[in-house]
């Protein structure tokens, strides 16, 4: 945070039902000051794929939505108010203030992870930034249009709508190499292995009595053809030319910000090469 000057810092996501929101307020306020206002705080209930995480913290996924709403309310109060007394269903706290206050006023962007259209509409109605994941490019564009239209219908000004769209982030897995074949050979086996590991942990630890979601299996190698397909949920994988085409398609669909990760066990050397290609071959065309 201190050594960098331009890069944004963020959480994608903090599963707030599994955290103490006052501690989160203290830690994020400090980080926002150290970075001089480059922090985005992404929050969410977490995934029903990983219900075992809730069990590990002594709670259940069924309480997650209510815990998230209450934790976010307390987080904002801790960031912005003095002499806080909060009595909720899950948190009962009193404290004089959080110091330092966040660098950004009134507080860092608080973006909610949204999977369903219903949760997206809920956030749009109150002008909250959102994080979107796991859709095709065309479906992502439809979600962004829904978000924009809902904010406008709720009475927000065009300036407010544009500000929220500037803080809307879309998550994708990414790996770039010199050629499509090289990128696929680097990324896909590691990606599938990571998926199999997660499925194994879930099968062993997820409690059967909880509401468990089944994660869709990743696309197979034959789904990745020479040109990107905006109608399927493909990762951003390929040569820098192919990935640049994907970025252009996402830009045209209304995407302004991307969160790019690589959760497979790709080597450090190849991951660094991927990031270098991103910064040198792709990013200059989209600034």
What are these regions (language model features)?
Residues 1-6, 28, 32-39, 123-125, ...:
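Acidic (Asp/Glu)-rich catalytic clusters
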Residues 9-12, 39-43, 110-113, 128-133, ...:
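Hydrophobic faces of well-ordered beta-strands that scaffold small-molecule active sites
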Residues 12-22, 104-115, 174-177, 229-241:
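Active-site mouth loops of central-metabolism enzymes
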């Amino acid at each position: 945070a201190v050594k960098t000057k331009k890069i944004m810092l963020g959480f994608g996501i903090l599963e707030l039902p599994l955290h103490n929101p006052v501690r989160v307020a203290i830690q994020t306020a400090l980080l926002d000051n150290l970075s001089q206002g480059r922090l985005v705080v992404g929050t969410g209930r977490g995934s029903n794929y990983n219900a075992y995480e809730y069990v590990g913290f002594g709670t259940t996924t069924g309480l997650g939505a209510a815990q998230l709403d209450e934790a976010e309310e307390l987080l904002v109060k801790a960031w912005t108010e003095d002499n806080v007394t909060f009595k909720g269903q899950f948190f009962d706290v009193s404290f004089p203030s959080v110091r330092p206050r966040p660098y950004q006023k009134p507080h860092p962007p608080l973006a909610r992870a949204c999977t369903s259209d219903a949760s997206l509409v809920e956030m749009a109605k109150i002008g909250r930034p959102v994080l979107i994941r796991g859709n095709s490019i065309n479906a992502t564009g439809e979600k962004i249009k829904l978000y924009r239209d809902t904010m406008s219908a709720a009475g927000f000004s065009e300036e407010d709508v544009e500000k929220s769209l500037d803080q809307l982030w879309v998550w994708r897995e990414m790996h770039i190499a010199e050629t499509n074949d090289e990128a696929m050979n680097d990324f896909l086996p590691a990606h599938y292995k990571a998926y199999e590991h997660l499925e194994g942990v879930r099968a062993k630890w997820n409690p059967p009595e909880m509401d468990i979601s089944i994660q869709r299996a990743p696309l197979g190698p034959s789904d990745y053809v020479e040109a990107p397909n905006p109608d399927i949920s493909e990762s951003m994988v390929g040569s820098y030319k192919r990935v640049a085409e994907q970025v252009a398609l996402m830009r045209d669909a209304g995407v302004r910000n991307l969160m790019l990760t690589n959760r497979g066990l790709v080597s450090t050397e190849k991951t660094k090469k991927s990031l270098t290609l991103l910064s040198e071959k792709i990013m200059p065309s989209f600034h």
